[in-house]
C-alpha cells in the first residue's frame, strides 16, 4: 500500500493523480495516508456530517494556512474550495486528502458531481496528488465503481486496506509480551481480527493475555461494546435491525438460509445477497465434495471482530445494560473459542 502511495506522490509532481483508499473502520487508513505524505506539503480534511457551509468554514483557514492561498470572502460551497485547490495545483505540487469521502452523499450529493466536473476541467494541467478514503464500503463502491456515477473511471490508483495477518499479529504480541501463549495469540486474533486500532487499544491497556484481553473488551465503558453498532448502522440505514439479526444468527451457528428464514420468519435471500455482494461482510461456504449446483450453502462472517461482536456482545446487550458485565465476561471466557 505504501509503495502505491509513494508512486502516486512521485507521479503527481508532473501529472495529476487520483487515488481512492477503502477499508473498514479502525483499519489504519488515516494513519497510513498521513505517514505517506509527512515530508511533503499536504492538505488534510475530514468530512464530518454537518452542513456544507460549516464544513467550508472549517476547511477555509486550513487551506489558507497550509498552502498560503489568500481566500477572500466567505465560501459556502465545497465546489468553490475544490476549484481553488485545483487551480493552485497548476502552479504547485501538493497532496489533498479527503477523509470519509462518502459523507458528502449525506451532506449534499451534488458535491460528487461538482468534483467530477472540476477534476475533468483542470486535471490535465494539474500537479495534484488527490487522495480520498472512506470506510462505508457500499457507498464508496457505488461512488467509484458504478458506471452511472460521476466519478466512475476517474481514478488512477485504488487501494483496499486489509487487517494484519496472523504473522504480523504474532510479531506485535511478541514485542509486548515475549512469553505469550498460543491461547493469548488466538484470543488476540479472535477479538481484533487483525484490525490495527483494536490491537493498539489492547496493547496500550497492557492486556497481553487471554483473561486481560477479554476483561478489557467487555468491561463497562470499553469501546469494543458499541463498535459493531457504530460501524454498521450507517451502512445499513433504516434496515439495520434485519441485518443485525441475520448477522447475529450466522455468528451463533445458524448458517443456512433455511435456518435463518425459519427464525426470522421471512425470506432473507435479498438480505444475504446484499451482505455478500454489496457489503462484503459474509461469504458462501459449501461443504467439501458438494456438487457445483448443490443447495447446501452455508454463510460465514468474514470479519473476525464482527463475528465476536455479533456472537457475544449484540445478543447480550440486556446484560450489559443492567451493568452485569462480569456475567458476560465469565460466559465468554468459557465459550469464546
What are the language-model segments listed below?
Residues 85-115, 136:
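Conserved P-loop NTPase "ATPase switch" module shared by AAA+ and STAND
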Residues 19-23, 104-107, 117-148:
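Sensor-1/coupling segment of RecA-like P-loop NTPase cores
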Residues 156-184:
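Conserved small helical "lid"/interfacial subdomain of P-loop NTPases
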Residues 29:
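Conserved lysine of the Walker
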